[in-house]
């Protein structure tokens, strides 16, 4: 889902939820908590795949345009991580405009308490803050990937001003019934070799 132009704001946001503390990235000690949240969301049909500890380590080892110390916000209750949000961005080559990618993940039983809304507000505000440094902040956009099965998050995003711009579908084809049609004359199938990579990509 995508929202319109990113607008800078000097209005500070106050994050307050009874029993919840908000903090920034503490290091690799945060990874198990993130995995637990993502696993709970996967089990509830709110995540596309089950992420492992190694997945999270690899993700953080290859971050681009993201400083975990300032671009992640974590929520804790009774010393346990219950949610987090992040902001990363990419710059389009032709226009130099930035697209900010926002994520918000909370335990499903924390959604009705408003935690995800608070984290989304922070992510949007933080994207605007970073956008003020871009070449054309008035053209920057925010992007958020979610699943249609997560109707709570879809409704929250729409309430915040996001609207769908594209859909992805996972489809399966029965390989036993594929037609055995001959290739057109002059066309042949060849294996891909390393020397072909540049031309293909």
Please name every model-derived segment.
Residues 1-14, 89-187, 193:
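Acyl-donor-binding surface of acyltransferase catalytic domains
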Residues 16-17, 43:
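Anionic, Ser/Thr-rich low-complexity intrinsically disordered regions
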Residues 23-28, 39-133, 143:
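Conserved donor-binding loop and adjoining core beta-sheet/short helix segment
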Residues 32-34, 57-59, 152-154, 199:
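Short, solvent-exposed polar/charged micro-motifs at secondary-structure junctions
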Residues 21-34, 188-201:
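A short beta-loop-alpha structural element at the N-terminal edge
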Residues 37-40, 159:
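Residues within well-ordered alpha-helical secondary structure of globular protein domains
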């Amino acid at each position: 889902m995508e929202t319109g132009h990113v607008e800078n704001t000097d209005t500070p946001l106050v994050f307050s939820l009874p029993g919840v503390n908000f903090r920034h990235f503490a290091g690799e000690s945060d990874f198990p908590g993130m995995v637990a949240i993502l696993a709970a969301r996967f089990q509830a049909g709110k995540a596309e795949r089950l992420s492992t500890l190694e997945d999270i380590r690899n993700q953080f080892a290859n971050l681009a345009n993201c400083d975990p110390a300032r671009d992640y916000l974590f929520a804790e209750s009774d010393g346990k991580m219950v949610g987090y949000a992040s902001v990363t961005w990419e710059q389009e080559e032709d226009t130099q405009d930035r697209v900010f990618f926002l994520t918000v993940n909370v335990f499903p039983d924390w959604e009705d308490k408003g935690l995800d809304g608070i984290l989304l507000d922070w992510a949007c505000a933080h994207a605007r803050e970073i956008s003020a440094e871009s070449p054309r902040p008035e053209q920057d956009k925010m992007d958020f990937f979610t699943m249609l099965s997560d109707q709570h998050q879809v409704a929250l995003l729409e309430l915040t001003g996001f609207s769908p711009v594209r859909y992805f579908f996972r489809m399966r084809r029965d390989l036993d019934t594929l037609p055995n049609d001959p290739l057109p004359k002059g066309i042949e199938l060849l294996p891909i070799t390393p020397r072909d990579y540049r031309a293909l990509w």
